[in-house]
A protein has these predicted regions:
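Glycine-rich anion/phosphate-binding loop at the beta-strand->alpha-helix junction
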Residues: 191-284
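Internal helix-turn-beta structural module
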Residues: 47, 292, 299-382
Length: 382
């Protein structure tokens, strides 16, 4: 019988696209730290020893954008001049202008409308303690472990990718781990056999163990399968903000509306509505009302209330999807202003999301399960 596999990937914070995300979110945080009402849509491009920062920013904050970018690059670990991209020598150009007055008119405090149209998804399931799908949770844990190793091993470099294939049975239950792929940039002085042993024993084995799996049970493990990975980071590939939207969410396990997160202030529903959708889905699962849930929201630009809200429990709900939807409508203010208030989003909290992930991280406000007891009690009264 053919295996039922699902695969998700992740990247480290030194991947070129994630470098761009980190710079954009660092600039967002710098603006919000001084002016919580900053309107920010910051896009970044990085390539060989060059960084372009552009976009629309309306703020009373005084921010040295190049300095913020250099610090973000330095924090990631690009500090070696010979690698073709480093914090001290990278050329940085800025092309920033203010937000369109037409957009601002429909999203100001009096109107509180959405900053754009679009649909956003949030999901949760019982496959992991953090209520995330196992393939993306493992991929994320592996990439975060790689990042830790980069900062403790001078022979490793920040650019890396991970990928995990999980086997499921016909009922959708996890059977085991079929394949793990890890690629990490490194110094030319790191012998390949030593690197592979280091990654197998110091990265893959402990992460699998944390999730209850033995590395010996994995059918296929590929570590730097093409061999040397010395040329990497922005010197190897150009990076752009918002190009890792599947990595940033659920690894393809749940749907995606297409909007990116990084560099956007919370009036942009691409970000804030995706966060509240995750919050609602996670709380439904935490309340025991379903074992797997996807929530969809959709908005029209300048309109405060969502044009649609839909819950899909994949047949696992203890009450109907329509009743689950009704519970959410009664308990959560889904206007942009309401989302911002509930999750307290006008704060400089975004740079860590570009580094360690948006979902499945316990201290994120949208990861809290404070709504679960309320939903559980209300469900008993329906």
């Amino acid at each position: 019988m053919e295996k039922r596999l699902f695969t998700s990937e992740c990247v480290t914070n030194g991947h070129p696209d994630k470098v761009a995300d980190s710079i954009s979110d660092a600039i967002l945080d710098a603006c919000l730290a001084q002016d919580p009402n900053s309107r920010v849509a910051c896009e970044t491009m990085v390539t060989t020893n060059f960084c372009l920062i552009c976009g629309e920013i309306t703020t009373t904050a005084t921010v040295d954008y190049p300095a913020v970018a250099r610090e973000a690059i330095r924090k990631i670990g690009y500090v070696y001049p010979g690698d073709g991209f480093d914090a001290d020598s990278v050329e940085i150009q800025c092309r920033i202008h203010t937000q369109s007055a037409d957009i601002a008119l429909g999203t100001n405090d009096e109107v509180g409308g959405a900053g754009d149209q679009g649909m956003m998804f949030g999901g949760a399931c019982t496959q992991t303690p953090e209520l995330m799908p196992l393939p993306v949770a493992l991929s994320r844990a592996l990439s975060n472990r790689l990042t830790q190793c980069v900062h403790s091993n001078d022979l490793l470099r920040p650019d890396g990718k991970t990928q995990v294939s999980v086997e499921y049975d016909e009922a959708g239950n996890v059977v085991g781990i079929d394949t793990v792929v890890v690629s990490i940039m490194h110094s030319a002085d790191f012998a390949m056999d030593e690197l592979r042993k280091y990654i197998r024993e110091g990265v893959i084995a402990p992460v699998l163990r944390d999730y209850g799996f033995d590395i010996e049970s994995v059918a296929h493990i590929h570590i730097n399968p093409t061999g040397n990975f010395v040329i990497g980071g922005p010197n190897g590939d150009t990076g752009l903000t918002g190009r890792k939207i599947i990595v940033d969410t659920y690894g393809g396990y749940f749907s995606h509306g297409g909007g990116a997160f990084s560099g956007k202030d919370p009036t942009k529903v691409d970000r804030s509505a995706a966060y509240i959708a995750r919050y609602m889905a996670k709380n439904l699962v935490a309340a025991g009302l379903a074992t797997q849930v996807q929530v969809q929201l959709a908005y029209a630009i300048g309109v405060a209330q969502p044009v649609s809200l839909r819950v899909d429990s994949y047949g696992t709900g203890v009450i109907s999807d329509e009743k689950l939807t009704e519970l959410l409508r009664k308990t959560v203010d889904l206007t942009p202003a309401g989302i911002i208030r509930r999750l307290d989003l006008r704060r400089p909290i975004y740079a860590p999301t570009a580094e360690a992930g948006h979902f499945g991280v316990a201290d994120r406000p949208w990861e809290q399960t404070d709504l679960a007891p309320i939903l559980k009690e209300m469900a008993q009264e329906i």
